[in-house]
């Protein structure tokens, strides 16, 4: 059994914000260490320039989760922390409810799902004041922010500060609070709004490429 490795982008104690401001970083679990995610949140919790943290949590690892602890520390340090916690996650309902209660008791704003939908997206966005403007740093993943399952499940997380992507991540979080208004997406594929059409379009494109003898 091999131990997970650190990502080379984050060696030598470099700031997550300094790295992600310059380039996107793709993490591949369980081969990369999941510690990168709670470490990113810990840095955000103590960074004086960070004003807000928004995150979706589908399955709480435990009541002593490093993710929960980092978010609570951020709230204690005066950050505005919003957590979309899906209490309908199968077999984890009780654990998630307890997690929601703990977060609320520490001043975290908790949204317990969206009426009529199950939120399965894995998103986090940190807002930071830089040079008189607000810059956003997002993580978009296929797997839960869960340090236990990250050891055995194969997943990816993209860390990015690209404005065209982070703006649409903000649209998603705004929808969680005001779900009467459905945003339009250009970069993100978001169910149940545009995923079917987006995937059909991509399939048709590859069919067309194959017919023309192109790589498909």
Where is each model-derived feature located?
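N-terminal localization/anchoring segments of enzymes in phospholipid and broader phosphate metabolism
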Residues: 1-216
